[in-house]
Amino acid sequence: MENLNELKINEEAVIVSVNTGKDIKRRLMDIGFVKGEKVKLILKNFGDNMRAYKIKNTIMALRVKDSKNIIIQKAK
């Protein structure tokens, strides 16, 4: 399985699991990063430490270190 950090711009995937600490997991779930949800990479910043994802018709920015803990299955 791949992690969310491996998506290319405009590539879509489905979230398989969120493997983070309890507090971060709760925050991610509150903003829509839950198992079965579709997610799409919209933007990578120049410093490559933040990424913007579209999830539930909302654009959310995540740090790379957090996105590495979200396991995905790429859409076909």
Where are the model-predicted features located?
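Short alpha-helix capping/helix-loop boundary micro-motifs
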Residues: I24-R27
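C-terminal structural segments of small proteins and small subunits
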Residues: D48-K76
